[in-house]
Design a protein with these regions (language model features):
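Active-site donor/metal-binding and catalytic loop motifs
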Residues: 255, 261-277
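Terminal low-complexity segments of carbohydrate-biosynthetic enzymes
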Residues: 285-428
């Protein structure tokens, strides 16, 4: 993997390896298994709370983690304040193994995506230096505060088989100052996202990400194994949205992602942030324009159901080796035969599904306006109630006209019910 480092933009670095805190719980299983990467830009006001939360990490029994059980990388990029100085000072105060890298990035690279990639690259290299087996890279934001069991819960999910773990987020007390209309919109979006997430879990269940789970993708809480990080070539080189780009690449390679409901990070509710396109920009945009479009993942519920159902169908066909022999799926999705053949030859299901979404006219995304959310929520609730209640009947009823081409499919999956069963019944 090519690391984004050069002597032209790294001005200085300092490494701190303080002695063990005598009050910390020591266990050989925790010895420097993970490193937390934090990109920082002018965060002297919020960085102390971030590092304090990491200093207070405990295992799942509530015992303090040994101070040598994890490391922290602070990548201070283009800072005009005392962020780097404070990081060094707090590292000594909290007895944290801390590496502070100060960098002056050129304008073309002075963005959140590049800073986070560099921070995570330093974390990966640190694990490599110490030859850590099963090493894990975590990342959060300097304006965020993780829970006391954040590291332990992430590692538990990794130990359960995940290649990457995503945590949920909540706004801090600054979020209380946002307009009431924005809070109401946030409640509607959260409610609708939860409904779509459960619908997807029913129609395309994944063993490594069982229900319940969330669907939040935020760099405020990501954990990824070092092996997976190297496999995807590191954090994608994008100026913003690096968290979503990383998840997309993991999905493309069929890596196992757990959206862990037990992990929640408190992040800043400010509207003047440091990273263009980040949470602060989104909050400011929606405060200034209450009718701004919703996130692209909040699509009309009928399309979301169709997307999840077909994803589950095709996942099963590929797993059973029947994607090539059963060509009915391509005709129903409006995908030309040559494209379908290329999809069948894709190296992973994730790559195949990405091509399906690109080629099929059924899955073109339409952005929702916030005024549409109440009706979409009502429809999604009805659909979900039917799916929950009639799951057994739907599993047995797979001989409808729509699913006749799929008789050879597994009979015990909601993903093989026809469109009229999953969508059409919810019009009333």
């Amino acid at each position: 993997m090519d690391r984004e480092f050069s002597e032209t933009d790294v001005l200085s670095s300092a490494i701190f390896e303080p002695p063990l805190n005598s009050t910390s719980y020591e266990s050989s299983c925790w010895r420097r298994r993970c490193v937390v990467a934090i990109p920082v830009r002018d965060e002297e006001q919020r960085l102390p709370a971030c590092l304090s939360a990491l200093a207070g990490q405990r295992d799942r029994r509530g015992r303090p983690l040994a101070s040598d059980s994890f490391g922290i990388v602070v990548f201070a990029n283009n800072c005009r304040d005392r962020s780097a100085y404070l990081a060094r000072s707090l590292g000594g105060q909290f007895s944290l193994p801390l590496r502070v890298v100060e960098a002056s990035l050129p304008p073309a690279k002075a963005h959140a995506g590049s800073a986070r990639r560099r921070a995570m690259d330093v974390a990966e290299a640190w694990l490599g230096e110490e030859r850590v087996r099963g090493g894990v890279i975590l990342t959060t934001d300097a304006d965020s505060r993780v829970s006391a069991d954040w590291i332990a819960t992430n590692l538990a999910a990794i130990d359960a088989g995940a290649d990457a773990v995503l945590g949920d987020i909540a706004l801090d007390e600054e979020g209380d100052l946002l307009p009431l209309a924005l809070h109401r919109r946030g409640e509607l979006e959260s409610a609708y996202e939860a409904l779509l997430t459960e619908l997807s879990a029913l129609l395309d269940p994944l063993d490594h990400n069982p229900w319940p789970h969330h669907a939040t993708i935020s760099a405020a809480s990501i954990a990824i194994t070092r092996d997976a990080y190297l496999a995807v070539g590191g954090l994608p080189r994008v100026p913003l949205g690096e968290d979503k780009a990383l998840v997309a690449e993991l999905v493309r390679l069929d890596r196992k992602i757990r959206f862990c409901p037990e992990i929640r990070v408190i992040t800043s509710g400010r509207v003047e942030g440091r990273a263009p396109g980040g949470v602060a920009d989104t909050l400011r945009l929606r405060s200034n324009d209450p009718d701004a479009f919703c996130d692209e993942l909040l699509e009309p519920f009928r399309v979301a159901i169709k997307r999840a159902k077909w994803r589950g169908r095709l996942r099963w066909l590929r797993r059973e080796g029947k994607l090539i022999s059963n060509s009915a799926w391509a005709r129903e999705l409006g995908i030309p035969a040559p494209d379908a053949q290329r999809i069948c030859r894709a190296p992973s299901f994730g790559a195949a599904w990405s091509a399906v979404e690109h080629k099929s006219p059924l899955f073109h995304r339409r952005l929702l306006k916030p005024t549409e959310l109440p009706d979409q929520i009502s429809g999604a609730r009805r659909a979900l109630a039917r799916l929950r209640k009639g799951a057994l009947a739907m599993r047995e009823h797979v001989e409808s006209e729509v699913v006749m081409p799929f008789r050879s499919m597994h009979p015990h999956s909601l993903t093989h019910c026809g469109d009229e069963q999953v969508c059409g019944l919810f019009a009333g």
